[in-house]
Amino acid sequence: MDTAQPAMTAPPAQAAADEPVGRVTAVRGAVIDVAFDTGALPMIEDALVITTDDGQPIIAEVQAHLDEGTVRALALRSTNGLRRGAPVRAAGGPIEVPVGEAMLGRLIDVSGVPGDNGTPLPPGTPRRPIHRKPPPLASQGAETRIFATGIKVIDLLTPLAQGGKAAMFGGAGVGKTVLVMELIHAMVERYQGISVFAGVGERCREGHEMLTDMRHSGVLPRTVLVYGQMNEPPGARWRVPLTALTVAEYFRDERHQNVLLLMDNVFRFVQAGAEVSGLLGRLPSRVGYQPTLATEVAGLQERIVSVGDVSVTAIEAVYVPADDFTDPAVTAIAAHVDSMVVLSRSMAAEGMYPAIDPIASSSVLLDPLVVGGEHARIAIEVRRAVEHYRELQDVISLLGVEELGADDRRIVGRARRLQRFLTQPFAVTEAFTGVPGRSVPVADTLAGCKAILDGNCDDWQESSLYMVGTLDEAREREQATRNAKPVSEHAEP
């Protein structure tokens, strides 16, 4: 496979003869200066192929024209061993990556080179440039369809749109990656579509675990994995979301298939852009981010659209540094999404998984015209009950729940039961917990929440509602608990 890499990353042979040839004049980490003595300079965002002594080409992307004969480029792999004077060939266009059916079940890097020790890609595999304009506005789909996930708290409070963008915001260790994995599982179970996963700046161990899990679960044959991991240069982490999006666009445009695009983690894309900006000598903006932060985020997000009746649905994990939701990177990403799923560290500490905050999370789809009046009403009542409970928590911690009025005690009891009912075991965690995953239809979620709000479960143990699927399952658990109690406990005092 190694011998095939230069051919995969090089431009078409017939164009190579006319492309300018240059030489490396300076190497500063991932930043390379290249001089071209003759011919026109490569354009901004064009690819360069640099020949190295070990025979493995380095792909770089032009970022600036320094003078009439020199460009500054950003390397997409390590420049260790690169020397001044190394020959450089301009590719004549942006980086192109392989797309199509041959990519299903494969793991590739930012330049499209397979990294799964599999067979080489077949000759004639189509290629597309990673820099593309969004589809014309007139061709973009405007119909709103709900993307049912089977996850109760998401379907109830932050419904996702098929063809829309949803982001999962949370700090370290609150369950973002597990939630993304469960959504991949839901896509395979519920929708006959393609999944494209972009691993952006995450740990190599997590990437290997995901590849292994997908092989064992049977998900891999309908999935493309695109990795730019934590140990790779910032240029690779900066461009890998565009590679994944290009693969997804091909299935949407040419194969007319619905695509689920998952990115973990979009914050690392922004972080890599900040590194690149610093390497290129640009003045930083707020909190040290690149001055082009909003432009870079928009350039990625505005390409994620539906065309006609074929959709690209994006689910993005977003790391929140120091749990600060006012961070410029977080706010820039949030401006582009339809649904904000906020993961709470305090809920994770209480074991309320998925640790989704029902108050801070929101969705533009939670509208009676989209989800229906009954759904919207139940969601509002659930939020109102949980919010009232939170307002009383300080009083409860100081004086105890017994000091509350009868109405407040009733609301607190129902809010606690709602919080527990909205937890559920996931299929992707079954190997660790031993509890089979549950996928719950929206109708069952609404029926369960309505019953709790109406007081039908006021005399139930809270534990009966914890980590279940439907209310029927909770009812069986409650009945089993009551049957297991000694007779004396049932007797009147």
Swiss-Prot record:
It is an enzyme of class 7 (translocase). SUPFAM superfamilies: C-terminal domain of alpha and beta subunits of F1 ATP synthase, N-terminal domain of alpha and beta subunits of F1 ATP synthase, P-loop containing nucleoside triphosphate hydrolases. Keywords: ATP synthesis, ATP-binding, Cell inner membrane, Cell membrane, CF(1), Hydrogen ion transport, Ion transport, Membrane, Nucleotide-binding, Translocase, Transport. It is found in: Cell inner membrane. It catalyses: ATP + H2O + 4 H(+)(in) = ADP + phosphate + 5 H(+)(out). Its EC number is 7.1.2.2. Belongs to the ATPase alpha/beta chains family. PROSITE patterns: ATPASE_ALPHA_BETA. This is ATP synthase subunit beta 3. Produces ATP from ADP in the presence of a proton gradient across the membrane. The catalytic sites are hosted primarily by the beta subunits. One of its GO terms (molecular function) is ATP hydrolysis activity. The gene is atpD3. GO terms for cellular component: plasma membrane; proton-transporting ATP synthase complex. F-type ATPases have 2 components, CF(1) - the catalytic core - and CF(0) - the membrane proton channel. CF(1) has five subunits: alpha(3), beta(3), gamma(1), delta(1), epsilon(1). CF(0) has three main subunits: a(1), b(2) and c(9-12). The alpha and beta chains form an alternating ring which encloses part of the gamma chain. CF(1) is attached to CF(0) by a central stalk formed by the gamma and epsilon chains, while a peripheral stalk is formed by the delta and b chains. The lineage of its organism: Bacteria, Pseudomonadati, Pseudomonadota, Betaproteobacteria, Burkholderiales.
